[in-house]
Amino acid sequence: MIAKSYFFPAVSSALIAALVVLLSHTALTAQFEVETTVEFIRDENGPDELSGITRGSDARWWAVDDRTGKLYPCRVGFDRSGSVEKFEVSEGVGLEGCSNAEGCAADPLRADIVYVSDEKSTSVTAHDVKTGKCVEKVVLPEEFRSNVRWNRSIEALCISPDGLRLWAANEDTLKCDGECATDQKGGTVRILVFTRKGAGAPWKFSGWSRYPTDAIGGKPFRNRTISGLVSLADLGDGSLLALEREMSRKNPLFPSFRSRLYRFRPAAAAGGEVAKELLWGDDVFFSNYEGMALCPADGGASRRLVLVSDGGGEAVESVRTLILKEN
């Protein structure tokens, strides 16, 4: 077994501004205290393109990468402030049928099952964490599958804390929904919801919401930009967190990465557009944050949100903790 360790010095960055977010009848006062630690991956044989991370109900962590299609057990340690101080990745197991894993979500009702979204095959499948064997396939709507764009397919994935709702979304606009995001206007993605009656019961497609993504903030870097929705997290109160990321050129020499965290409530009617509220946003230098995992409240008012960066291309691999304090 390989054990790759990333030890992070306690580096305090800043207190991000406190916001009062009104969503339906629920008021959320969110103050994010961000502590950033960055570590380059020096072992070329290690997983340097982590694209998704999840925390199981039994406190186990897993991550996926979009290069090898593997699931990696992880160990995450926090200091007293809630910032990540240790991140260990062990030998991964190949995921049957996956080659471009983007998102992952541990099943709250089955301890050894993790769901994975695969961009290349436009699929959501469940896997045994020990063997990688596919044990279930979630049936996606045909209109969704037949209209995805290359490298902009299904990306974000999460499951509600009670294990009865699964959410999945594409990264950028479907062909049937218009054009992709540009520096002039944002795009539109579909957030699909599936429901089930209990552990092991089949997932049933139960509707979708229209989610507007941000316009790109810069010009193409080396003739390309990256923009869209990359991760979701269910807060368990009827609302979700959405992570958007962007890569563009804002200076002559280097690419610029930007991350933004929004909160929204799914639309009441199928195909309705959601109203999103910005909680946090930052230019994150060379960190391409693609995956996030929400930790339980643990009896307190604070929630830890762990973000991982895909270290492929121009980006570096890093880990960041956002602490959401709800009063």
Language model feature labels by segment:
Residues 27-327:
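Sequence/structural signature of beta-propeller domains
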Residues 1-8:
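N-terminal secretory signal peptides that target proteins for export/translocation
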Residues 12-24:
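Bacterial N-terminal signal peptides
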